């Protein structure tokens, strides 16, 4: 290790948490709901995958789903990243993405192509 980060590595002793960590960064004002944590992890990957389709990096839903499971470790129970969006329901996914964006930042804003697809209720 480089000797930098969250832990102190004293010579010949056990590592321990850097004492200034809590004072420098503190705790969040309010706890983040577990559902938000789970969905933030899934939604940010799903939104980026839609952008990859928009930009031609991915060309088929099948490639996106298989690649997301085997390539980036997206949970297999979802059927893949685009199947996750389909299962969530496109209009509901867009609505929830907007809620996450309002609470946690613009990286959760749904791309225009996803909004248009949701308006027509056309699955991937």
Residue ranges and their predicted role:
Residues 1-124:
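N-terminal glycine-rich phosphate-binding loop for ADP-containing cofactors
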């Amino acid at each position: 290790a480089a000797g930098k980060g969250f832990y102190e590595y004293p010579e010949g002793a056990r590592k321990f948490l850097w004492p200034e960590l809590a004072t420098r960064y503190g705790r969040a004002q309010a706890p983040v709901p577990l559902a938000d944590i789970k969905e933030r992890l899934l939604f940010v990957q799903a939104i980026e995958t839609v952008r990859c389709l928009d930009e031609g990096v991915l060309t088929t839903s099948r490639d996106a789903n298989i690649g997301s499971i085997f390539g980036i470790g997206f949970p297999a129970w979802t059927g893949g990243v685009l199947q996750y969006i389909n299962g969530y329901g496109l209009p509901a996914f867009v609505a929830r993405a907007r809620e996450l964006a309002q609470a946690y930042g613009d990286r959760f804003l749904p791309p225009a192509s996803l909004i248009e697809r949701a308006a027509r209720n056309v699955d991937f």
